[in-house]
Every structure is written in C-alpha cells, then in structure tokens.
Design a protein with these regions (language model features):
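A structural micro-motif
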Residues: 5-7, 115, 131
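Composition- and surface-driven signal marking solvent-exposed, interaction-prone regions
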Residues: 78-79, 100-103, 131-134
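Core SAM-dependent methyltransferase catalytic element
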Residues: 127-148
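Conserved beta-strand signature within the Rossmann-like core of class I S-adenosyl-L-methionine
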Residues: 113-121
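Extended basic-aromatic, gly/pro-enriched interface segments that bind polyanionic ligands
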Residues: 2-87, 91-95, 99, 125-126
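Residues that form or immediately flank small-molecule/cofactor binding pockets and catalytic motifs
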Residues: 14, 69, 122, 138, ...
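A short glycine-rich, Lys/Arg-flanked "PGG" loop and its adjoining helix->strand segment in the class I
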Residues: 101-113
Length: 148
C-alpha cells in the first residue's frame, strides 16, 4: 500500500460516539460518496452491502481517542509525538480567539520543524508570528516558524 513509509494516523474528537465510529471504520455509501474520489474508495475500502469498511492494512495504521483539544494539555505530549502533517480542519470555528491561540501554540510544539499544518478554508492561525503561510496548487497550508 504505502511500502517503505512509517505512517501513523492519529485522530481525536471530543465526542465518544464519533471516536467509536472512526474506530469501526464502517461508512454508509452516502457518507463515502461525499467528496471521496472513487479511486480512493476502491483502493482503501472494502464493499460490504450498503457500507464501505476501511481495509485492515489501513485500519492498523489508525489510532483514535477521545480528547479535548481545548484542555490545558494536548493529548500528544510525549517526545515521540512529533507530527509531519496535522489536519485541523474546521475545528477552531467555534473557539474563542484566546482558545485558538493556546491550541495552535500546542500544535506548534508537536509539529515537526519542517511539518505542515492544514486548517479549514476559513481558518487562520491566531498568532501569525508562529506560522509561515504557503500556497501550492490553490491549497493554503502553514509551516511552523522557528525561533531565531
């Protein structure tokens, strides 16, 4: 599948039901058809009646847990919790400016120095001094700025 890659996918949600659904990896046809190209569906999911189930080789790379990203400490604090890519899409829409600032400071700490942060299209870092905005193929993403 991704031969030679050391890939780990970590997912969090504050809602236990959402985490449970992600762990099950089973999605109805209607859910799958919302924005996921057919070539990815066929490659990474098995068809089971009206549902699509994440293939075992993909599922073993995925770890989900219930977590509150607004808490005082991010759920990823260990030295080995350095991420190359973080997708934090449409998460901060409901947070205050101060909460966004605290969350993104924590994200900055766990993102590898050459890592990439993807936010939702209407989201921006609360503290732009920590981030460099880049554009590639119409997609905006952010890299952490390093202290000088």
């Amino acid at each position: 599948m991704l031969v030679g890659w050391n890939l780990r996918i970590e997912g969090t949600d504050i809602c236990a039901d959402v985490v449970e659904k992600a762990q099950a990896g089973c999605y109805h046809r209607i859910e799958i058809n919302r924005g996921l190209p057919a070539r990815f569906v066929v490659r990474y999911f098995d068809h089971l009646g009206e549902d699509w189930v994440v293939k075992p080789e993909v599922k073993k790379m995925c770890h989900f847990r219930q977590a509150n990203l607004c808490g005082p400490v991010l759920p990823f604090n260990r030295a080995e919790d350095r991420f190359d890519v973080i997708f934090l899409r449409n998460v901060m829409l409901y947070f205050s400016q101060e909460t966004r600032k605290v969350l993104l400071a924590g994200i900055h700490r766990v993102l590898a120095p050459d890592g990439i942060l993807f936010l939702g299209s209407s989201e921006q870092p609360a503290d732009p001094s920590l981030w460099t905005a880049l554009l590639a193929g119409g997609t905006c993403y952010f890299r952490p700025r390093q202290p000088s």
